[in-house]
Amino acid sequence: MDRKTLDDTSKFLSYVLRHQPEAIGLKLDGEGWADIDALIAGAARDGRALDRALLGAVVENNDKKRFALSADGQRIRAVQGHSHAAVAIAYAPAVPPAVLYHGTASRFLDSIRERGLVPGSRHHVHLSARRATALEVGRRYGSPVLLEIDARDMHLAGHLFHQAENGVWLTERVPVRFIREA
């Protein structure tokens, strides 16, 4: 399968499994799972060719491991990044490493300095244990800035952290006092 097909399909899946399942008449359960046959049928109604082999290839080859298949192979979901109100994945609380990172664009710094990191339309703020990963994320939005999060002190102050299946760290928000520019 060619890279463009995989990337285009990944973007489509991100859209319908994270944000707008109703765009193709798809229903997600509370944990974000969608029936694969319903997804394929909805994609076909939207004029997109999608089959189980392509879905499997996207799940297997996605560099950020954004998607997961159920154990029985009948359902698929986005691992994290949801903005859809019906989805509330029950991530287990986890103890974060001492420092986590967040990549952003320089144009967002004034807002972050004032409000901290907030999830925006998503359910969680996304953090990384790797500087390089966070910088890569920041580059998607413009001139990248790396933020260092004092996750240990934040956790000790009572803020909950979760880790998605793909290794992304999640929290509800990051107050200003735990953020410094790296």
Swiss-Prot record:
Keywords: NAD, Transferase. One of its GO terms (biological process) is tRNA splicing, via endonucleolytic cleavage and ligation. It holds the Pfam family PTS_2-RNA. GO terms for molecular function: NAD+ poly-ADP-ribosyltransferase activity; tRNA 2'-phosphotransferase activity. InterPro entries: Ptrans_KptA/Tpt1 (IPR002745), RNA_2'-PTrans_C (IPR042081), RNA_2'-PTrans_KptA (IPR022928), RNA_2'-PTrans_N (IPR042080). The keyword NAD applies. It is an enzyme of class 2 (transferase). Its EC number is 2.7.1.-. Belongs to the KptA/TPT1 family. Removes the 2'-phosphate from RNA via an intermediate in which the phosphate is ADP-ribosylated by NAD followed by a presumed transesterification to release the RNA and generate ADP-ribose 1''-2''-cyclic phosphate (APPR>P). May function as an ADP-ribosylase. NCBIfam families: PRK00819.1-1, PRK00819.1-4. This is Probable RNA 2'-phosphotransferase. It comes from Pseudomonas aeruginosa (strain UCBPP-PA14).
